[in-house]
């Protein structure tokens, strides 16, 4: 039977997977994970919003009249186009990849001074 032959052939090998979340693989240095926005550097130009195809970023007006991006983590495809387009380097790509949550409000990163 071919299935037993396959089991005997592959059984002595080391396992290919990890016991996640108890064991974690090292994240590559060029990994593109969740983005972080430094709202102190952001001038609200909106270039990141224009570049974001899945509309994970949107400009919101703060009470002081300035505009800052709101980040919808669940919509993001982690393409880092917003990182490349930001003239002030206010957006950075992190190595954070564990983004699952039970709280839908945690999926939206609001600029300071706004609430949803």
Q: Where do the protein language model's features map onto the residues?
A:
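Non-ligating segments of multi-cofactor redox enzymes
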Residues: 1-62, 70, 84, 88-116
